[in-house]
Amino acid sequence: YKGYGVEYLNKISQYTGWRYEYINESWENQLADLKSGKVDLICNAQKTEAREKDYDFSCMPVGTEQAVLYTSEDNEDIYFQDYEHMNGKKVGLLRDSYQNEEFEQRQGEKNFHCPEEYYESEQDQIEALEQKKVDMILTGSISKHDSLKIVDKFGAAPMYIMTTKGNTEVMSAVNNALEQLKAEVPDLTENLTEQYVMDKNRNSKPLLTREETEYVKSVSAPIKIGCIGDQPPLIYTDKETGKLDGIYIAFLKKFSEISGIPFEFESLSPDTDPIEAAQSGKYDFIAGITACQEMIDEPEVHLTGGFFTREFQIVTE
């Protein structure tokens, strides 16, 4: 076995000396087995008032998980956060999952309603979606389904380790290990999230709304980008090819590949004023700038979110 929870439990075992036997059961059966004492631990579970009556939880969370709503990759009827078209669509839920409560709240917030079907495992949910028994399925973000299309993400909540109510011996050992891990490996949760959650999302298709999808389809001419150089390795002209290259260009080409929006690059001199270039009407975007307060305060210029951070150093003899 491997994954986020397994990695966390392996770290805990370095302090407890435990060896694990993993039981592959439906989520409903896992909860029942834990309640009866048939199993000792469940890793990665949300804390609720109802669950606290039957289970004990670790003293601190071991990560954060969102609820993720998926549909089939070829479903052209539902787009990201397309609540109007989600209304009335049938959704497959995992029985006794915390995310079900989050989804109920989401429907109320966004004013849509979906008939629900319940399944014993995520595999059952996926099969129901593939067989067109449901239009969407809801899972946690720790599980990643690359062959499906994400249509909503919401309800980030902390995850804990659970044990049987009153099992103080096991939970005390878990809590002691977690406290030591926090002191000795403070970035463990961040690193595991990077490895098992963020890495899975990097090559995903963009989460486009219906309006954004229609815009991409409507783009006939390349978006013109003025690129301020010469700033190797960020942006520069390759001497052999005569073409623009560097981190900015690689990023924009990848963005173009994922989004389907074509770009056309034009080199600008290093002393180009980015605000004047943006206001000239010759370019749709200006690349190769460092955000500063002047640009942030400029009402006629809009900045994208940052995607690259660099440090400057003063060097002297």
Please describe what each predicted stretch is:
Residues 35-36, 55-57, 73-76, 90, ...:
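Extracytoplasmic/periplasmic mature domains of Sec-exported, cell-envelope-associated bacterial proteins
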